Amino acid sequence: MQLLCWWQVLLWVLGLPAHGLEVAEDSGHPWREERPVPALQVGAVYLHEEEVAQDHRDQARAAEPMEASLGPRGDPMVVLSVVPGAAEDQRSPEAHDGTCSAQGEEDPSCGRENLFGLQGAGGFQDREEEYYAEPGVTEAEPVATEDANSTDSLKSPKVNCEERNVTGLENFTLKILNMSQDLMDFLNPNGSDCTLVLFYTPWCRFSASLAPHFNSLPRAFPTLGFLALDASQHSSLSTRFGTVAVPNILLFQGAKPMARFNHTDRTLETLKIFIFNQTGIEAKKNVVVTQADQMGPLPSTLIKTVDWLLVFSLFFLISFIMYATIRTESIRWLIPGQEQEHAE
């Protein structure tokens, strides 16, 4: 009797799955073809199908504010596969052409994977590259270059010189200061007129070669003043203005030195260029070095004079050598006498 009861229970248990399969076949919806199982996210475990459906509904509600902030969709697909190959297949043909930039330049940001798949909104990195473009990529306009060139050509002079009135003057010559004259007496400390001053020595061959060219400058620039002084006679002025070698040419505005001529080629043309670059005053045309400039007022030949400073230096050196020699001989005579006294 007990065996018969257990047998009926076993048949009833085995009959339930069979009865369910027949009902499913009659309705035309097999269990295995009812609907595909949704893709499981990494790290998520679902125990029942109701939990899966509920989870997808929660994700849809959470995605609605994000989609509203990013803008309208450019593609009906919401989530792409995280596999790069699957994401590239869903992209529009524009991304594969490399011409997504409006300027017609290839933008490397067009070929990146976007995990959100919202092409209408665009990636965050693409926006950053749009707002912060690399410097130097955009070519400068030709108009800006032309403006820069015109600005360089119209530069203001470094020294703003007040040109003197030359009305009624016909003879423009160089003035040479003697030993008793002071340079500051010929410069106006309260004015803005410019004067070119030459420090020279008559026994220097470089000063002599410069003399004809410097003598012709007053005719080329009649509105400027030109002075020359012997550096050996005005040693205090030479030290004051840093004259360590001659010839030395300084441009003064009033009583203030403004520029120094540092070229080794000291000719009339280089002096004209120097004055024009510093003051903006153009030289008169057809001014050349003449035979009169060779004669003076600045001498163009070496003047042979006695250098008394050199004579005094030689006399002092010879006297010191003679005194040292005499003292050395007397010391030699004293040393043997001292040795004899110690021996006794």
Swiss-Prot record:
Residues 55-119, 136-156 are annotated as: Disordered. The chain crosses the membrane at residues 306-326. It comes from the Eukaryota. Glycans are attached at N171, N178, N190, N277. Residues 327-344 are cytoplasmic. Residues 1-20 form the signal peptide. Residues 88-97 have a biased composition (Basic and acidic residues). GO terms for biological process: cilium assembly; positive regulation of smoothened signaling pathway. GO terms for cellular component: ciliary membrane; cilium. SUPFAM superfamilies: Thioredoxin-like. Pfam families: Thioredoxin. Keywords: Cell membrane, Cell projection, Cilium biogenesis/degradation, Glycoprotein, Membrane, Signal, Transmembrane, Transmembrane helix. Residues 163-280 form the Thioredoxin domain. The keyword Transmembrane helix applies. Residues 21-305 are extracellular. It is found in: Cell projection, Cilium membrane. Its main location: membrane. It is a single-pass type I membrane protein. PANTHER family: THIOREDOXIN DOMAIN-CONTAINING PROTEIN 15. Acts as a positive regulator of ciliary hedgehog signaling. Required for cilia biogenesis. This is Thioredoxin domain-containing protein 15. It comes from Mus musculus (Mouse). The lineage of its organism: Eukaryota, Metazoa, Chordata, Craniata, Vertebrata. The gene is Txndc15.
